[in-house]
């Protein structure tokens, strides 16, 4: 539906109040800023694999990338937030904002942004392609991750059973 893609941006915003307690804790809800960054340093906060997803996205779009960067920052509660597994007081961490970028010679080619926080505004998924023509897809509310994973497995099963032995990626 389009020509060559020059840049891709994917944004996902999730209101963690609608998700299981384990995810709420994984994004740092209820922590202080210091506690949040301590767990970041230990690799215990954030979405695992976002940089790898950026690399896979670049590969699938035919973009040559030679460097990848990632940033993880807290989202703070601007007011007390109730709902979910616990109450988050104003000023505490409500969740996280994580960004992964794929670069080609210093130029950003793919940007993935993930915000998961209690009370996050306007949950949803947005996909934007800088191509000819430009494409923007908005999914209000977003696609629930657990359900999407189950659908991916079911839809991949016929191709997996018909494939040759060996390691495959989602691109194959």
Regions found by a protein language model. Give the residues of each.
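Active-site-lining helix/loop region of Rossmann-like oxidoreductase modules
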Residues: 2-125, 136, 150, 155
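C-terminal helical cap and adjacent loop that interface with cofactors, partners, or active-site loops
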Residues: 118-172
